[in-house]
């Protein structure tokens, strides 16, 4: 069993890999969790997610309390001090334990000579905490978002940007999707209650259930048997707008990790579904999801810009394009997004989205439906993207979602407690 004081150093290393090396926390965290006892996995996750959620504040505090930054091989200590601040500010770890374990973390990262420095900075913070937090409350860092993203949100949502930022800074609820081929939603809610848990149905998405309190999946009735899947309510809107029917040929493009593929098959079990994604590693999760749910689909690796490479001349009755995007609508669920994205990424993503739309549109049958979806809240990837697509595509018409001047439906994070999501339903004339 690993010593618990390794948790702080592991959390510091994880955050450093995200911020300094641009790695996704979902890739960094699992191997680190293998290094700690089962009872400590939740705390390690809390420290990593929490530090990334509040990184602006923790960085601001370090700049106030240290005369010069830690650089080079000492850089991990910079993030170790952040882990200490986070514990003192946001967790129920007793302050004396937070200090002691964080200071000991210096030994684990082979910087024992800096134990005194870490201890001194954390104790100085304790002494000045009230004054520092009052000053922080009026600083630009208080939004806990990078400045470029704050500006984009202010421009796009002059009256709602603060609400979006506040929602992004909250912990996300746990949403589930009841597999209608096994149970009705009300029937499964009864099983959940029998298991001592409570859930609430979504008013618009017929399979969605929000847990009153998040729970491990193995505690959910029938999870292993495929009765229920973890999926945010807003993501479930994709299949609602797509409205798949049995017997149809359906393309799920950019399909990994397969949550929407399986939802399509739950709604239309006799549909012929092709799931395509460019990332071969992530496609393994599509197979895993289909296997757990006992479903079958054709799964291929491919680039959405070149459909001839993965489907020849085949045409489809319905296409779901869950386009690659900035993921600015799911920041509360993936706080590392704030520090992985750059302002310049948005134009590049919008260009990629346009190329995929143009490439895949000819593969839709006349009278067919294409649902364009993103987990972004930025208009360049959403409303503006569809507006320009409609202008250059005479045989495309908007259906159900918005108007030609304001196309699509934009869900903001926290609305009905779902993530930020955009949908545009297009019909081929």
Swiss-Prot record:
Location(s), subcellular: Cytoplasm
The species this protein belongs to is: Salmonella schwarzengrund (strain CVM19633)
A single Gene Ontology biological process assigned to it is: rRNA base methylation
What protein family is recorded?
Belongs to the class I-like SAM-binding methyltransferase superfamily. RsmB/NOP family.
**What PANTHER family does the record tag this protein with?**
NOL1_NOP2_SUN FAMILY PROTEIN _ ANTITERMINATION NUSB DOMAIN-CONTAINING PROTEIN (PTHR22807:SF61), NOP2 YEAST -RELATED NOL1/NOP2/FMU SUN DOMAIN-CONTAINING (PTHR22807)
Q: What does this protein do?
A: Specifically methylates the cytosine at position 967 (m5C967) of 16S rRNA.
Q: Which residues does the annotated region (Disordered) include?
A: 397-419
Q: What enzyme class is recorded for this protein?
A: transferase
List, alphabetically, the HAMAP family matched: 16SrRNA_methyltr_B
Q: Which GO terms describe its molecular function?
A: RNA binding; rRNA (cytosine-C5-)-methyltransferase activity
Query: Principal place where this protein is found?
Result: cytoplasm
Record field: compositional bias (Polar residues): 400-412
Question: Which InterPro entries does its entry note?
Answer: MeTrfase_RsmB-F_NOP2_cat (IPR049560), MeTrfase_RsmB-F_NOP2_dom (IPR001678), NusB-like_sf (IPR035926), NusB_RsmB_TIM44 (IPR006027), RCMT (IPR023267), rRNA_ssu_MeTfrase_B (IPR004573), rRNA_ssu_MeTfrase_B_ent (IPR023541), RsmB-like_ferredoxin (IPR054728)
Q: Name one GO cellular component term.
A: cytosol
Recorded protein name is Ribosomal RNA small subunit methyltransferase B
For this UniProt record, the keywords arranged alphabetically read as follows:
Cytoplasm, Methyltransferase, RNA-binding, rRNA processing, S-adenosyl-L-methionine, Transferase
The leader peptide range reads: none
Quote the catalytic residue positions: 375 (nucleophile)
- Tell me which domain of life the UniProt entry assigns to the organism this sequence originates from: Bacteria
Q: Which reaction does it catalyse?
A: cytidine(967) in 16S rRNA + S-adenosyl-L-methionine = 5-methylcytidine(967) in 16S rRNA + S-adenosyl-L-homocysteine + H(+)
Please tell me where S-adenosyl-L-methionine binds in this chain: 254-260, 277, 303, 322
- Enzyme Commission no: 2.1.1.176
